[in-house]
Amino acid sequence: MKEELVKLIIDSGCIKFGHFILTSGKESNYYIDIKSLITNPKALKLIAKMIKEESRKLGIEYDKVAGPELGAVPIATALSLETDKPLLIIRKKKKEHGTGKLIEGEISPGDRVLLVEDVTTTGGSVIRAAKILKEHGAEVVGIFVVVDREEGARENIEKEGFKLYPLVLVSDLFEAAGVSKD
């Protein structure tokens, strides 16, 4: 399944070269434009199936699936449908209108939540989401990411007491594509 995902990422043209500013604020000579992948039903089904299988193999039990907006929402939705587990969406900022929620979906103290993300660089966005879930009494039992750029996310996430499970490492992508990230 991993090889199939790597091929889909490459064939979807998700690896872009040039000058980019990442969400983390870091500058990079490449960008993983995962949005074209996570709007593809075939890719979403594969990603959801992989996360379901990997979490089962690792013995990770969870009650709910969560993802920070925007990139992780399609992934979390696909996983929610694949597993029949309720979905939580973590907003970037609290709504200024309506209910003013930071988390969409029903969350209760003691919920075991599997958090998903599209791409990690330093892990800042997903750490923020994990802390919000924790503040609401949930236990984040694992964080799955489609692509880890291998730029400190794993270490930063583990420093905060969470565990990162990448489906694909950026080095896997460059190796399969036969290119150097430098």
UniProtKB/Swiss-Prot annotation:
GO biological process: 'de novo' UMP biosynthetic process; pyrimidine nucleobase biosynthetic process
Residues noted as binding 5-phospho-alpha-D-ribose 1-diphosphate in the record, renumbered to the chain: 91-92, 95, 97, 117-125
Domain of life of the native organism: Archaea
GO molecular function, one term: orotate phosphoribosyltransferase activity
Record: residues binding orotate: 121, 149
Necessary cofactors: Mg(2+)
Pathway: Pyrimidine metabolism; UMP biosynthesis via de novo pathway; UMP from orotate: step 1/2
Catalytic activity: orotidine 5'-phosphate + diphosphate = orotate + 5-phospho-alpha-D-ribose 1-diphosphate
InterPro entries linked: OPRT (IPR023031), Or_phspho_trans_dom (IPR004467), PRibTrfase_dom (IPR000836), PRTase-like (IPR029057)
EC number(s) per entry: 2.4.2.10
Family designation: Belongs to the purine/pyrimidine phosphoribosyltransferase family. PyrE subfamily.
Subunit structure: Homodimer.
Functional summary from the UniProt entry: Catalyzes the transfer of a ribosyl phosphate group from 5-phosphoribose 1-diphosphate to orotate, leading to the formation of orotidine monophosphate (OMP).
Name of the molecule in the record: Orotate phosphoribosyltransferase
Lineage: Archaea, Methanobacteriati, Methanobacteriota, Thermococci, Thermococcales
Originating gene: pyrE
